């Protein structure tokens, strides 16, 4: 089932804030009012996951400049996130919120729960300030994601939101031409 153009479902969970080195409660309301990235991954203390989360951290400053809040989510607890942050060279660099979802509520809400394993799949979602999913990417377990493409998608989503009636073509870059769908373009692209 696609979540595109659907509002995120309610949730409440415990999270770890690496910048403040503290635990706090987070909910779907935290994702509203600004752009958000929600990055699901299978498990802490694993193999591909730390490479993806470190790569996401490498784009964190760019995402912050775009006004984007970043959340990583796995079915581990917030306590395990803290332990992983304290012991992994890659994860110790992370500055964004790490949400624990041991109840699998959020993972189910975003339709990325591997029911057989009880773990999240590799899913990334861009959520607009209204709490509506604008983009989604879900990969097989052995395929890591590239956070630089995420920045590109967010810029396009933000542009389209700010410019109703325009769409961003393939390989669109900030400042390049967009399209205005209409009869005059039919068959001319």
Swiss-Prot record:
Chain ranges of the Thioredoxin domain: 2-159
Enzyme Commission numbers on file: 1.11.1.26
Family: Belongs to the peroxiredoxin family. AhpC/Prx1 subfamily.
Name of a matching Pfam family: 1-cysPrx_C
Key words of the record: Antioxidant, Cytoplasm, Disulfide bond, Oxidoreductase, Peroxidase, Redox-active center
GO BP term (any one): hydrogen peroxide catabolic process
GO cellular component: cytosol
Principal localisation: cytoplasm
Miscellaneous comment as given in the Swiss-Prot or TrEMBL entry: The active site is a conserved redox-active cysteine residue, the peroxidatic cysteine (C(P)), which makes the nucleophilic attack on the peroxide substrate. The peroxide oxidizes the C(P)-SH to cysteine sulfenic acid (C(P)-SOH), which then reacts with another cysteine residue, the resolving cysteine (C(R)), to form a disulfide bridge. The disulfide is subsequently reduced by an appropriate electron donor to complete the catalytic cycle. In this typical 2-Cys peroxiredoxin, C(R) is provided by the other dimeric subunit to form an intersubunit disulfide.
Function: Thiol-specific peroxidase that catalyzes the reduction of hydrogen peroxide and organic hydroperoxides to water and alcohols, respectively. Plays a role in cell protection against oxidative stress by detoxifying peroxides.
Complexes and interactors: Homodimer; disulfide-linked, upon oxidation. 5 homodimers assemble to form a ring-like decamer.
Annotated compartments: Cytoplasm
Source organism superkingdom: Bacteria
Active site: 49
CDD domains: PRX_Typ2cys
Biological source species: Staphylococcus saprophyticus subsp. saprophyticus (strain ATCC 15305 / DSM 20229 / NCIMB 8711 / NCTC 7292 / S-41)
Classification via Gene3D superfamilies: Glutaredoxin
GO molecular function: NADH-dependent peroxiredoxin activity; thioredoxin peroxidase activity
Protein name: Alkyl hydroperoxide reductase C
Catalytic activity: a hydroperoxide + NADH + H(+) = an alcohol + NAD(+) + H2O
